[in-house]
């Protein structure tokens, strides 16, 4: 983004931001799977790897954000004012996804490292379809951002909202089970409940990220569209 042409800088900035959002979304999907696999399989190695990689990703995100902010300051002022909100919403969403991974990872790593009782098979069986649906939607989101084609964005957002409702139901079911379960499985049950809570939060975060990308890449965002975004979760 060393060009002196403001319009060219805007084009390059949009490409750079797309690459940032899609790469962090893809990293989150892959690492989320790695963490939950490590917990369900009682395998400490992938959990340790995820811990180290996520710290590195946080450092890299700060570097990318600094570069993009410099680019934002060099585009036409009217466009910069319009895009500022969506840029920061997208960047903050990337950061929040990494924090969400850490909040899932830490209890899983501690649980496996201490050789506590494993999660019940019934919980795994109900969780895996939810995880697959989450990953499928995140992949669709990556595809929309990579191609800069948001034709399916509304459908993705709707299915994401439906997924949040499914996870909410599982959370309630899990809390009911915990009240009736033996103390021997309580620790694993608490970790699983945390996974469900953070998974629900993760859905909210990447839905924000998709909206942010769509509005940042758009040539014009109407006040009505902006108001719709501010009223949604």
Where are the model-predicted features located?
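Cytosolic, long alpha-helical scaffolding segments
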Residues: 1-233
């Amino acid at each position: 983004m060393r060009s002196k042409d403001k319009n060219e800088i805007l084009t390059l900035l949009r490409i750079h931001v797309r690459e940032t959002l899609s790469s962090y979304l893809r990293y989150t999907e892959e690492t989320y799977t790695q963490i939950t696999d490590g917990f369900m399989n009682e395998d400490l190695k992938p959990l340790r790897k995820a811990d180290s990689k996520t710290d590195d990703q946080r450092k890299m995100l700060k570097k990318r954000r600094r570069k993009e902010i410099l680019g934002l300051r060099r585009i036409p002022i009217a466009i910069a004012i319009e895009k500022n909100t969506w840029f920061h919403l997208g960047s903050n969403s990337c950061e929040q996804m990494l924090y969400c991974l850490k909040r899932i990872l830490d209890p899983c790593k501690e649980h496996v490292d201490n050789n506590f009782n494993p999660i019940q098979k019934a919980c795994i069986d109900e969780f895996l379809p939810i995880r697959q649906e989450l990953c499928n939607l995140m992949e669709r989101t990556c595809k929309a951002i990579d191609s800069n084609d948001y034709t399916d964005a509304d459908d993705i957002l709707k299915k994401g909202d439906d997924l949040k409702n499914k996870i909410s139901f599982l959370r309630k079911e899990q809390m009911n089970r915990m009240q009736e379960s033996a103390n021997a499985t309580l620790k694993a049950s608490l970790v699983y409940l945390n996974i469900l809570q953070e998974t629900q939060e993760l859905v909210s975060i990447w839905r924000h990220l998709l909206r942010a990308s769509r509005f940042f890449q758009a040539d014009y965002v109407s006040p009505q569209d902006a108001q719709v975004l501010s009223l949604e979760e």
